[in-house]
Amino acid sequence: LMSGDSQAITRTAGGIISDDHSGSGSGRVVMKGIQSGPHLFPFIDENGSYLPVILQPTSGFGADVTISSNHTAQDNRPFPSGLSTVAVTTDLIAGLSTDNLIDRWWEITASGLTANVSFSYSALENTLPIDLRLSYLGVVRWTGSGWTQPAGSGLGVTLGTGMVTMSNVSTFGIFGLSANNLALPIELVSFEAKAKATEVEITWTTAAEVNNDYFVIERSADGRN
């Protein structure tokens, strides 16, 4: 695409099939000189499921962006070029294995760009262990020798299509979606404690709760421990 405008690609039906592992640039979308605004990359899989990637630059306008999205088998193969294994014990997520990853890879290349990116996947690609399938997911990136910690958030789905969004991405490469075991079962928006005479009033607000049964509030006796 020679236009980097946010309306360079629009969709009413259909989409771009990126599930091509033949190499030589096959199945990739190249956008020249990306500009501001949310950019839709309307990928579909070989079954016609709509799995868009939405990329919204926050800085670095004018960068060239190359992006692809590929379905895999449950063992996460075929791997993208440059990735030879998933189970790396020296990575930042100790013990990451094929059981922890959604069955899809994404590859993005861009230089000097910072953006918010949303990745979509089909529920059929969610082959995580049953107890993790509806948990929070995070975006992981291959560094060349290991994986970054999960970042961003989105809930796992077992029907339809799921989406996970990562903010302020400035380093690109090979991305996957992992069960985010580091995430709390709640997304906390606010927490306040106010003195009222001899008591303390505590209020909090959550944006989302997953498998959360109750809250436990603890008070320090000495203000330190």
Show which residues each predicted segment covers.
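Short, charged low-complexity linear motifs
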Residues: A123-D131, G162, P185-A193
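Generic detector of ordered, mature protein regions
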Residues: P78-P80, I130-L132, G160, W204-T206, ...
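Ser/Thr- and Asn-enriched, surface-exposed coil loops between beta-strands
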Residues: L155-M163, K194-T198
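Self-processing/autoproteolytic domain segments and adjacent N-terminal interaction modules in large
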Residues: L1-A151, T165, T171-N180
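Short, compositionally biased serine/threonine- and acidic-rich segments at solvent-exposed termini, linkers
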Residues: G173-N225
